[in-house]
From Swiss-Prot:
Protein name (database record): Glycerol-3-phosphate dehydrogenase [NAD(P)+]
PANTHER family for the chain: GLYCEROL-3-PHOSPHATE DEHYDROGENASE (PTHR11728), GLYCEROL-3-PHOSPHATE DEHYDROGENASE [NAD(+)] 2, CHLOROPLASTIC (PTHR11728:SF1)
GO cellular component: cytosol
Catalysed reaction, written as an equation: sn-glycerol 3-phosphate + NAD(+) = dihydroxyacetone phosphate + NADH + H(+); sn-glycerol 3-phosphate + NADP(+) = dihydroxyacetone phosphate + NADPH + H(+)
Source organism per UniProt: Acinetobacter baylyi (strain ATCC 33305 / BD413 / ADP1)
InterPro entries from the UniProt entry: 6-PGluconate_DH-like_C_sf, 6PGD_dom2, G3P_DH_NAD-dep, G3P_DH_NAD-dep_C, G3P_DH_NAD-dep_N, NAD(P)-bd_dom_sf
Length: 357
């Protein structure tokens, strides 16, 4: 076994060969920290905004995020701040890595300080009650601001560890896509572009549902056949739902769709997978969330998507079975049983029109 790492095989970024973009990440969770660290490593003048002054001071002094990424040394040039105006005024890109339930509140708070900055969501969720995507919230609260969303198979610990990864920046603005690629693209982190904002955003939000399902099923030691069936039928559900909302189904064949789905459904590092595994092991929802200690967007997404799927008459048996297990006390094995019930005959439904039986 060799001790050679991927980071040993690539040349470090030569800072003076890059234009130093001024980048801020709002939110000091695991993914926000990973993106801030990556931008810093790429030569950007980077700040990370954290509500807790004590936590910000600790990051500046120790170069560790002890709460969310305690095993990884952060770039010493990364500056943590708790002053929101300082964090966003006169910056080039603002990445927002705030949980969906607080996303609108924070975007409202920064609005007085926003001029020409690009706002990019890192949040994979849907706002409760309104069914608004994070891009919708940005458009509503900051109507004149260029915006985008970043999504893909991006487990924070792997990114910070320097393992090769890829993501998608979706925006209607070519300038936003280019700026984000400039800030984050490196030899170990590829940033692909897309103009299907809602498609990319939906992939990131919906896959959290199926990560919970996979974690729950894994607690029962299911076989590889069942795992494969869950993932592929999950992709069918995602694309069915997305098409109803106007997204391009082909987006779901990329990194932000099947890529993110595969990574999240197969990794114990995934927060939503951990929640599902805990539920499948007999814990209550409150116990599972408390043990995780972080936000798992999938729980809220299940509620929002099930409600909208009923309104739109979209066939989503896995999502419906999950809702019944988590909120109505049905046995977790109902997830697997839901896949075996009569439904759509066709496999790839946006290629072959489906028929119900």
């Amino acid at each position: 076994m060799t001790d050679l790492k991927f980071t040993d095989l690539v040349e470090p970024v030569v800072i003076d060969k890059k234009t130093a973009l001024r980048v801020t990440v709002l939110g000091g969770g695991s993914f926000g920290t990973a993106m801030a660290n990556l931008a810093t490593r790429n030569g950007c003048n980077t700040m990370i905004w954290i509500r807790d002054q004590k936590m910000a001071d600790e990051i500046n002094q120790t170069h560790f995020n002890q709460r969310y990424l305690p095993d990884f040394n952060l770039e010493p040039e990364l500056k943590a701040v708790s002053d929101l105006e300082l964090a966003v005024r006169d910056r080039d890109i603002i990445f927002v890595a705030i949980p969906s339930h607080s996303f609108r509140e924070v975007v409202k708070q920064i609005s007085p300080y926003i001029t020409a900055q690009a706002i990019v969501s890192l949040t994979k969720g849907i706002e409760a009650n309104t069914f608004s995507f994070m891009s919708d919230i940005i458009r509503e609260e900051l109507p004149e601001v260029p915006y985008g969303v970043l999504s893909g198979p991006n487990l924070a610990k792997e990114i910070v560890a320097g393992m090769p990864s890829g993501t998608v920046i979706a925006s209607d603005s070519e300038l936003v896509r280019y700026a984000v690629q400039h800030a984050l693209h490196s030899a170990l982190f590829r940033v692909f572009g897309s103009d299907d904002v809602h498609g990319v955003e939906l992939g990131g939000a919906l896959k959290n549902i199926y990560a919970i399902a996979m974690g729950m099923a894994a607690a029962y030691n299911i076989g590889e056949n069942t795992k494969s069936m869950i993932i592929t039928r999950a992709l069918a559900e995602m694309s069915r739902f997305a098409v109803k909302l106007g997204a391009n189904p082909l987006t779901f064949l990329g990194l932000s769709g099947v890529g993110d789905l595969f990574a999240t459904c197969n990794s114990p590092l995934s927060r939503n997978y951990q929640i599902g595994y805990a539920l499948g092991s007999g814990k209550t929802l409150d116990q599972a969330i408390k043990a995780l200690g972080q936000t798992a967007e999938g729980i809220n997404t299940i509620v929002q998507v099930r409600t909208r799927a009923i309104e739109l008459d979209v066939y989503m048996p896995i999502t419906n079975a999950l809702y019944e297990v988590i909120f109505e006390g049905a046995p977790p094995l109902n997830i697997a049983l839901a896949l075996m019930k009569n439904g759509h005959r066709s496999d790839v439904e946006f290629v072959l029109p489906h028929h119900q039986v």
